[in-house]
Amino acid sequence: MARIIDLVPWEDGSTHVYASPAILLPIPRRRNQLAGVKQQLYHPALPSLRRMDMDSVKACLSDEHCQSTTYCRKDDFDNAYFTLLGVPNKPLQCLDITETGQRLRNRYHEGKLAPIAPGINRVDWPCFTRAIEDWSRFVSSAGEFKLPCASKKVESFSGYAVRYLKPEVTQSWRFCLNQNPSLDRYGQKPLPFDSLNAFRRFGSNYSRVNYLTPWH
């Protein structure tokens, strides 16, 4: 905010200072080089991905791009900190050494921490040995089941959404378990042309499905 000051002459030859009402003058914000003010990992005013994309599309230089400049000063970075939402009842384990770590550290300083490398003792580790014995007993008592015969050319199942005929014949699924629209690693897949039709057809058993046809 700035004031325009005028010197108003009076009749006696003297001048008096006259201050006009305040006029807001827009002052452009100063951009600072990020490497000159930032010395830590935390950024108090991290630019958004949309702003970085816009600056990249506009081909901004390094002194105007938000990836290399910031409006924050060095004091903002030095005084930047983050706090948890309220005082936690139980401190996070990542903020300090845990109780187990404190006990192990005390035992290590006292020389009472024995190495575990030679082997696992049954007295010190009863839960591990008991789990091994229980698993061995469970595997021994489990019943056997017969695998399906691999000589059959067409396997038949009940209660599953599978093909009625071999894939080489139909080239299509009888039942589709994928929701529409579906997602892949690149985003949402395009909708087939008849997905939203009230009386859509899935094609015959001997025709290719719609998603195998090219998109126009």
From Swiss-Prot:
Tissue expression pattern: Expressed in sperm.
Main location: cytoplasm
The entry's keywords: Cell projection, Cilium, Cytoplasm, Cytoskeleton, Flagellum
Keyword Membrane: no
Entry keyword annotation includes Cytoplasm: yes
Location of this chain's protein in the cell: Cytoplasm, Cytoskeleton, Flagellum axoneme
A Pfam cross-reference name: SPMIP8
One GO cellular component term: axonemal A tubule inner sheath
Record's subunit section: Microtubule inner protein component of sperm flagellar doublet microtubules.
Functional summary from the UniProt entry: Microtubule inner protein (MIP) part of the dynein-decorated doublet microtubules (DMTs) in flagellum axoneme. May serve to reinforce and thus stabilize the microtubule structure in the sperm flagella.
Stated name of the protein: Sperm microtubule inner protein 8
